[in-house]
Amino acid sequence: NPASGFFGMR
């Protein structure tokens, strides 16, 4: 999901 990608990138 988009949230996982966002926090995973950080």
UniProtKB/Swiss-Prot annotation:
Q: Which UniProt keywords apply?
A: Amidation, Neuropeptide, Secreted
A GO BP term here is: neuropeptide signaling pathway
According to its record, what are the GO cellular component terms? Answer: extracellular region
Q: What tissues harbor this protein?
A: Expressed in the abdominal ventral nerve cord (at protein level).
Superkingdom in the source lineage = Eukaryota
Give the modified residues of type Arginine amide: 10
Q: Where in the cell is it found?
A: Secreted
In Swiss-Prot or TrEMBL terms, this protein is called Tachykinin-related peptide 4
Say which species the protein is native to. Oncopeltus fasciatus
Q: What is the lineage of its organism?
A: Eukaryota, Metazoa, Ecdysozoa, Arthropoda, Hexapoda
